[in-house]
Amino acid sequence: MPYEKIVSDSFDDMPTPFTYASDRLFALRGNKHKPVGLILLKNISEQMMLMTNYKRYKEMKLVACTNVFEKKPDVQFNACTFLLPDGTVVVVFRGTDDSLRGWKEDFDILTQDNIPSQKLATDYLEQAAQKFDGDIIVCGHSKGGYVAQYGALFCKKEVRDRIKCLYNNDGPGFSDYSFIETENYKEMLPKYKHFVPQSSFIGMLLCHDDDYEVIKSKRITGPLEHDLSTWQISGDEIKRESGLTDMGKFNDLIMYHIVDGLDESQKAALDRALTADLDGTGQVGLLDVKDNAIAAVKGLVSAHDKIDKATQNTLKEIFADLDKGIASTAQAVRKGEFKTVKQRIKK
């Protein structure tokens, strides 16, 4: 929820009680449960208000609800710090929102080694640690899980030592395996939990650990399972699965195959094309695209047609290899060679 509309982005301001912030935000939204853009359905608002009735959440406080939204470079960064009654400091990073810039930054994870949100996450975590004493929990969902992991790995040693738990909820991996071979990663591993649904798509992107815990979702496809509200609960426990489905294994291998197969010039071409296409829509968010679908599609097509010839030829090369990759990956999963292929990739 957009608590940044209620809570200051400064660590120097007084923390705001969770119940007060939630009531104010609900009132700001007309005292009605409404979706937040096209992605977050109205159930997120319903859950927020239900939480205000439970003792577990009532005494929490919020501080430094930060929202950074920029273009060139594309940045969509959101973070908030929750202060628990026992003194624990919970630093939460939000995933991708409704904005097209946010989605572009997601694509940047695939084509660039560094994105602005990585440094923003590291700096934010260090500020929270400097301001408050106590154990620290770091967590996030989707891109939020990705930057939570990055911030926890690359913050100062004295901050890492205070981290009690690091939770990555179906967030993607890094651009290469060197990140998870660092001493920082090995140091953090006993505190680290990576949760993914059984047919995970986002959580299988790029180079990630294989120590993830598989969660049972009510849905049956990766993108739909990415919604945390579909993850099943039994009492106070999350329902686990013994492993990924074949679809989840396919997603893991094919996404790494596609991205790892790109050279630097191909990544640059893909980046230029995505930037041109998204700018061409003339829209700010996904809801705007939905409401102005005809104009958005026309703008996108027009912008894509204007992409230079060399870039278009490079895009054709990229997608020409896609069929082969899909076929070989599907065959590997069918033959039960998932672990063998994964070991080969890591080498």
Residue ranges and their predicted role:
Residues 148-157:
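Short glycine-enriched nucleophile-adjacent loop
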Residues 2-80, 84-89, 93-123, 127-135, ...:
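Alpha/beta hydrolase fold serine-hydrolase catalytic domain that processes acyl esters and thioesters
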Residues 139-144, 148:
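Gly/Ala-rich beta-loop-alpha elbow adjacent to hydrolase catalytic centers
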